[in-house]
Amino acid sequence: MKFIDLTIPFGIATPPWPTYEPLQVKYMKRLAPNGANGQIVSHSNHVGTHLDGEIHFYTPGKDIASLDFDFLAGDAAIVDLSDCCGDFDIYTPDMIEERVEVHEGDILIIHTGYHHFGWDQPYGNEVRYMVMHPGPDARFAHWCEEKKIKWIGVDCGSADHPMNTKIRDWMPAQAADCDAYFQETYGKSLPEIFTKDMYQMMHLWMFPKGIIHAECVGGDIDLLVNRRVQVGCFPWRFVDGESSIARIVAMVDEYEYQELMARKADLPKTKFGDCYDPVHVERLGGRGRTY
């Protein structure tokens, strides 16, 4: 068995979810005079590729240490929505099932393509990555429950639509752009589409049902879109942890791994060595406006 990394690089420049504490690192020992290098780190749980746990939003829920490996790893569907969703768009269960076969009890990884705007990417645009990515409607949340999805992964800042979170209040210019886009595209205003009772539904509705999610997935995800594969998420064994930084990988056999690595060799790379498919970037209009 071989692993394909679906985790973004983690460093002091990795942006946390807005208003959360970023990674900070300092040396507390050096080879001279201490004979060893040692570091102290501090950060929130919501920076880099991470798994949101139930108690992040649901007080009686499980902590991260309570999640067993049968839950964290297993059969998965990875779907690419970059051909149908752009800035502020809404995705539905139909869009997913038109592109990949999803079984009951699956892990579901959603490739919006917005990982291409992450801090580690040549087309980095933090505002698009955190504030303008696509997100789901209420039908999607109900469908996940019906499908008994184990957990969801997204390649952007949140499993919720950004304008169905506090970002709507923090970024009024983008909220106004989204409202205008919704009225033009869907015939309804932002408050009409994401009503008060739907607020952060992928967190507030889903976590009490045990359906949690990983955010900021990335790495070599472009190699594995619109297909089924084994996926594992490996957070800390974090007692009382509301969420956790995690390593997420896909698992393939040796023969397929060689095929995937041959394809990776033909694709452009980020400065950290992850590949990216220019087709996805072109669909989304390149870097887009910088703020």
Residues of each region from the PLM?
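Active-/binding-site microenvironments in catalytic and ligand-binding cores
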Residues: 1-291
